[in-house]
Amino acid sequence: MNKRAMLGAIGLAFGLMAWPFGASAKEKSMVWNEQWKTPSFVSGSLLKGEDAPEELVYRYLDQEKNTFQLGGQARERLSLIGKQTDELGHTVMRFEQRYRGIPVYGAVLVAHVNDGELSSLSGTLIPNLDKRTLKTEAAISIQQAEMIAKQDVADAVTKERPAAEEGKPTRLVIYPDGETPRLAYEVNVRFLTPVPGNWIYMIDAADGKVLNKWNQMDEAKPGGGQPVAGTSTVGVGRGVLGDQKYINTTYSSYYGYYYLQDNTRGSGIFTYDGRNRTVLPGSLWADGDNQFFASYDAAAVDAHYYAGVVYDYYKNVHGRLSYDGSNAAIRSTVHYGRGYNNAFWNGSQMVYGDGDGQTFLPFSGGIDVVGHELTHAVTDYTAGLVYQNESGAINEAMSDIFGTLVEFYANRNPDWEIGEDIYTPGIAGDALRSMSDPAKYGDPDHYSKRYTGTQDNGGVHTNSGIINKAAYLLSQGGVHYGVSVTGIGRDKMGKIFYRALVYYLTPTSNFSQLRAACVQAAADLYGSTSQEVNSVKQAFNAVGVY
């Protein structure tokens, strides 16, 4: 949640254009990837048949082999990695591109089949790999690649060798490095000290060169921490801003304490005391009388209460059970570190710093902050957006959008500002970002003003302002850069962006792909000729995203 994360990165950028496709432009449309000269979003009545849904996808790609340029049979180039039925009854499948059995990094295709008809394909596949002679055996070992990544972290980030934790297993991938795909190791270096980090490295498997690196802070591995057996009760306490809240707790007759353990939602909501250390998760919060009014309790009261609000929002509005869709437990640690000016999702739990009292109050005191960070978890379990460049900016925008919608859902002094409750307590009216007016805090509100440098992972906290503005306009309407947008309200805006995130976006999606995904999501929900579809187009036109 840094206002500006000053992190260097080299990016993957995709330029796209929209074109009519196939025999009937009225029925089919395409978003074209200018870098790879292949489609990245195709929609319409693509293919009908009685085959299994995945067979329709393979058959269509083979039929359009000159367009997608996969080379060979599609079933030999793609591996089905996920299949589900969405709330509209569509079969949604995710495929990962492979080269001689090796995953192609970020090359994920999402397909929708409804009533025996293939209706859309989204995602960027790398063409003509069969025409390249790519190495499939590494010249350096996994251990060497990991040592190179850890040493680079020490040299460039922490200035000392970090106490690395177990991360995602290192794997070989085909990495689309600019115009030259190559064999690389994907290495994950996670650590909590001296500063938290969750770095992804692409290490050339031939010579150990660092091809790319970025900090995916919303993932890391926590320690233990066990729930208690007991009776569900309701406690009361005061939050960071002094407001009283009733919270679900658990009484353990064995220990004689009340714990911040909510057994009424999914697999539970658990809140821990970090005790100003950097070891996670800390101790499950305990209290002797079920009243949490001490000043030290405030951050825990808010973290616990707001986690429940976020759970309720996703369940009641979108039918989603916890961040993973399968009722995963929600764990939060407060009082992390001393005066720590940050909050982050670490792949398994939420972590909240106390702030320094001047720049930030305790981060759990902002309901939109809690909603923002837990939405990173939703993104991790759905689109898996790479936290760099435009895909990273979409990642951040989704968290801002749904953090704000959670705030409106709870009706707790809602507005279109981000982090206003906990940022610069001595300055009235200040915030981290604004969705209604991104330029208010120096963020771009139009694609022509986007940041194109390498800091902040390629501007993930900056360029998110472009998408935030589009979402605001879609909800509230208005005129922006001479483009008039008819608002459709917060609820419909949220449903469109949620459907785009969960059922259409892929790890390397960019702004143009997001536009196409939102248009298709609106068509799914409200009809292809609806005002909602027109408003989506207007909103993205207004911010210069086509």
UniProtKB/Swiss-Prot annotation:
Q: What Gene Ontology terms describe where this protein resides (cellular component)?
A: extracellular region
Ordered alphabetically, the record's keywords are: Calcium, Hydrolase, Metal-binding, Metalloprotease, Protease, Secreted, Signal, Zinc, Zymogen
Which residues of the sequence carry a binding annotation for Zn(2+)?
Answer: 372, 376, 396
Compartments where found: Secreted
Q: State its cofactor.
A: Ca(2+); Zn(2+)
Identify the residues that bind Ca(2+) 1: 287, 289, 291
Residues annotated as binding Ca(2+) 3 are 407, 413, 415, 420
GO molecular function list? metal ion binding; metalloendopeptidase activity
Report the temperature dependence from the record. Answer: Thermostable.
Major subcellular site = secreted
Q: What GO biological process terms are annotated to this protein in UniProt?
A: proteolysis
Instruction: Name the residues of the propeptide.
Output: 26-228
What is its biological role?
Answer: Extracellular zinc metalloprotease.
Query: What is the name attached to this protein's record?
Result: Thermolysin
Organism of provenance? Alicyclobacillus acidocaldarius subsp. acidocaldarius (Bacillus acidocaldarius)
